[in-house]
Amino acid sequence: MASERQYSPVDRLLLQADAALRTLLPFSGASSRPSPAIVQAETDLNPEESRHIAGLMRINHTGEVCAQALYQGQALTAKLPEVRSAMEHAADEEIDHLAWCEQRIRELGSHPSVLNPLFYGLSFGVGAVAGLVSDRVSLGFVAATEDQVCKHLDEHLEQIPEHDAKSRAILEQMRIDEEQHANSALAAGGVRFPAPVKFGMTLLSKVMTKSTYRI
């Protein structure tokens, strides 16, 4: 069996810079899977519906920016090669979500949040620190983060009208993927975070959702 390619520190920094650019630059993230919205018919939305749904999709897009940064930060400092590989694979799947959300936001006549670079930097730092503590903590942070994302997706699916089949199809597939990421992280040995830690993460996520809904 071929051994895993060994990257130098400079190589890894260049890979991280490439990942950041692909995450933050418009239309730079190419999905490996077609958007679930492609097979859904477009329906007429009134201006208020379009504005609200675009705001929700902007939140989800920024959430994927944060997840991408979190995974990249953890991959940079993960101690075990298999954990690093798992983080990089999960980050690749998040690129799909980024591309799907951005495409839908544009279709609704809006744009991604201008705060994305800020949230990327913060999330990357958190991921790198978690990876330095231990791989089990790093994996646990993934599981807890994905749980938060799933809650946001459930809330948004309740708000998006049934006739917006395109947006709903995207969020439903994202929900499946995120739950799988959380379960995989726990199965790989991630620690289950206590309720107080999860509560703190919920408060921080509210800052993101409130700010990116409009800008």
From Swiss-Prot:
Keyword annotations from UniProtKB, A to Z: Cell membrane, Iron, Membrane, Metal-binding, Monooxygenase, Oxidoreductase, Ubiquinone biosynthesis
Swiss-Prot/TrEMBL cofactor(s): Fe cation
Keyword Metal-binding: yes
Transmembrane feature ranges: none
GO molecular function, one term: metal ion binding
Pfam families: COQ7
Cofactor comment text: Binds 2 iron ions per subunit.
Membrane topology note: Peripheral membrane protein
Name assigned to this protein: 3-demethoxyubiquinol 3-hydroxylase
Organism this protein belongs to: Ectopseudomonas mendocina (strain ymp)
Lineage: Bacteria, Pseudomonadati, Pseudomonadota, Gammaproteobacteria, Pseudomonadales
